[in-house]
Amino acid sequence: MDIRAAEISAILKEQIKNFGQEAEVTEVGQVLSVGDGIARVYGLDNVQAGEMVEFESGVRGMALNLEQDNVGVVIFGVDRDIKEGQTVKRTGAIVDVPVGKGLLGRVVDALGNPIDGKGPIVSTERRRVDVKAPGIIPRKSVHEPMATGLKSVDALIPIGRGQRELIIGDRQTGKTAIALDTILNQKPAHEGTDEKAKLYCVYVAVGQKRSTVAQFVKVLEDNGALDYSIVIAATASDPAPMQFLAPFSGCAMGEFFRDNGMHAVIIYDDLSKQAVAYRQMSLLLRRPPGREAYPGDVFYLHSRLLERAAKMGDAAGAGSLTALPVIETQANDVSAYIPTNVISITDGQIFLETDLFYQGVRPAVNVGLSVSRVGSAAQTKAMKKVAGKIKGELAQYREMAAFAQFGSDLDAATQRLLNRGSRLTELLKQPQFSPLKMEEQVAVIYAGVNGYLDAIPVNRVRAFEDGLLSTLRGRHADLLETIRTSKDLGDDAAAKLKGVVESFAKSFS
């Protein structure tokens, strides 16, 4: 065998040249105690608040309590494999998640790992989950409508891009249904080519049953809405730290769109469960409890999350992130700690009531208690013109209906008001999964506020609406297109709409 000395020496030289002299230094600590998803670790003196640490078993955790002699770490996973005396390694990284368009159509956990069995996430960028909200100067006031497709919301409680609108109500009142319809309503925009009209959807499920989340994802998939949506799931069986983190992870994913001049909406379903998870972590970390045993900084938990929803100014790309937090109340008690906190942080609330739900008013929006602090600034001119009257009429109707229970002999004006009110209430009902376009809502509400429904029996209002819409879609598509493109109800369009509604009202009876 021929041994070439020159060749061997060249190989040796190459290997010696690449030999690194620096030793790798990692800061490690030791587990003092572990239990209830919390580990006390000794020795990580330079660890940062919110930094990821890794246990011997490969499970990761987050340093939350930095105390004098130890660090309180919350564990992202099961603590069964973590034993006292094991080593814990610093990662040097604050908790971050993958972001970008590669996440669209996927279901991920609170750390951004895929849980839908569709393979790895294709993402080039990562972002920290907990960042500072945009300052005052880069923002712009909310002025573009964020259409939900629901008449009662778009007409009475309009939501704008960059707004935070709370959806609040007892369990089983249709809170998630409003969020779901909002996502489905974005489909026509995504089928078009106008990038500015597109609204990407991020849905964060916190503490829900896995079957519920699976059903939600299936509805999105069946309706072709999953392609422009991201679902982050921290279900009831996940550890409390994951439920605490999920809304922040979702927000980071939504901010990618906001900061790149695009528009997104994020739905936190729901923040009451996040607060409960945070309370559990805080109490186990021995932080002092406050009202309802929540820690003192539970307000800051939600305010720093919701302040990240914003409408950016032109200099910052003119993107937006709209937040729709959901809060579950107990027996309609909005004066509990978490509901009052979130009401004071958000720009308005959609209040859903069990009684209305069982009366068949669905969506079960209590128009009197619901409010949008952005108001008509987030409505198109066409909607503003027709919906301006409906608020006042419904307010008067509610007032009169309360009095009418006592007296039987009502004058003609009051009777007229009650008639109109009951028909408008019927008009605002809408079945699930059938969002309406803005121009269709304008036409229907126009018919209601201008008295074309007054002579029609209440139980026929739904049929009138369906008939009017099919007439408009079939024979007067150009009129709907005019309203859609101009976003206004000009004199010509109004006259044409009046003619269509009048002739339809005559033929319908």
Swiss-Prot record:
ATP binds at residues 169-176. Its main location: membrane. Keywords: ATP synthesis, ATP-binding, Cell inner membrane, Cell membrane, CF(1), Hydrogen ion transport, Ion transport, Membrane, Nucleotide-binding, Translocase, Transport. It comes from Methylobacterium sp. (strain 4-46). PROSITE patterns: ATPASE_ALPHA_BETA. The gene is atpA. It catalyses: ATP + H2O + 4 H(+)(in) = ADP + phosphate + 5 H(+)(out). F-type ATPases have 2 components, CF(1) - the catalytic core - and CF(0) - the membrane proton channel. CF(1) has five subunits: alpha(3), beta(3), gamma(1), delta(1), epsilon(1). CF(0) has three main subunits: a(1), b(2) and c(9-12). The alpha and beta chains form an alternating ring which encloses part of the gamma chain. CF(1) is attached to CF(0) by a central stalk formed by the gamma and epsilon chains, while a peripheral stalk is formed by the delta and b chains. It is an enzyme of class 7 (translocase). Signal peptide: none annotated. InterPro entries: ATP_synth_asu-like_sf (IPR023366), ATP_synth_asu_C (IPR000793), ATP_synth_asu_C_sf (IPR038376), ATP_synth_F1_a_nt-bd_dom (IPR033732), ATP_synth_F1_asu (IPR005294), ATPase_a/bsu_AS (IPR020003), ATPase_F1/V1/A1_a/bsu_N (IPR004100), ATPase_F1/V1/A1_a/bsu_N_sf (IPR036121). GO terms for molecular function: ADP binding; ATP binding; proton-transporting ATP synthase activity, rotational mechanism. Gene3D superfamilies: 2.40.30.20, ATP synthase alpha/beta chain, C-terminal domain, P-loop containing nucleotide triphosphate hydrolases. Transmembrane segments: none annotated. This is ATP synthase subunit alpha. It is a peripheral membrane protein. Its EC number is 7.1.2.2. The lineage of its organism: Bacteria, Pseudomonadati, Pseudomonadota, Alphaproteobacteria, Hyphomicrobiales.
